[in-house]
């Protein structure tokens, strides 16, 4: 992987940070994108919001102006919502899809043409074990990751003839700040006999 240019979204914490640092240790030039103002020491940080196409476009243009190529893209940016479906607003569900699914879509729409024209590239989309094994009271999170899996399989077949490989990684629970940062909707826990709070503890 030496001398390759890698881009990691959500690269300032958790899995994204660990991935970005591992790529750097492997010899890659790494750009990590997040909404935070400050990034990780030793990595190139660009403040960007994956839910905004213009923000993603500007970030990719900045990387291309500096490096002239992108060899690896890791779509890691995401968050979680927990709660019963009947007490989770449609707006909350949409915001989850905006980041976990359409954030990935926005990045890929900018990077795929670059990799296709170069004739090589690797795209890694962060999914979850919650995609094949949906988790009660994390219904919408599970749905976003199932969408990531379906999208990944289709995109892999689209891009294979151009030398671009696409895969999804499905981690289980990992000791990061992700669970603590999850947006928790506890309404209706009494109706569900405490199952909501127990399932997301």
Regions found by a protein language model. Give the residues of each.
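Substrate-binding pocket helix/loop in short-chain dehydrogenase/reductase
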Residues: 84-85, 92-94
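SDR active-site lid
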Residues: 161-201
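Active-site helix of classical SDR
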Residues: 108, 144-147
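Residue(s) in the substrate-gating loop at a strand-loop-helix junction
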Residues: 128
């Amino acid at each position: 992987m030496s001398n390759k240019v890698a881009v990691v979204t959500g690269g300032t914490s958790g899995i994204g940070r660990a991935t970005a640092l591992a790529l750097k240790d492997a010899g890659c030039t790494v750009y990590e994108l997040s909404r935070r103002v400050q990034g990780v020491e030793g990595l190139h940080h660009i403040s960007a919001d994956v839910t905004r196409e213009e923000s993603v476009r500007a970030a990719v243009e900045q990387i291309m102006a500096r490096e002239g190529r992108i060899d690896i893209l890791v779509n890691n940016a995401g968050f979680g919502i927990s709660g019963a479906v009947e007490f989770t607003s449609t707006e909350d569900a949409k915001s989850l899809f905006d980041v976990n699914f359409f954030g990935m879509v926005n990045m890929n729409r900018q990077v795929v043409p670059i990799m296709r024209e170069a004739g090589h590239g690797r795209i890694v989309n962060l999914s979850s074990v919650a995609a094949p094994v949906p988790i009660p009271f994390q219904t919408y999170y599970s749905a976003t990751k199932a969408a990531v899996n379906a999208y990944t399989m289709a995109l892999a077949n689209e891009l294979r003839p151009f030398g671009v490989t696409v895969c999804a990684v499905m981690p289980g629970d990992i000791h990061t700040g992700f669970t603590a940062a999850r947006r928790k909707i506890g309404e209706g826990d009494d109706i569900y006999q405490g199952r909501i709070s127990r399932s997301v503890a």
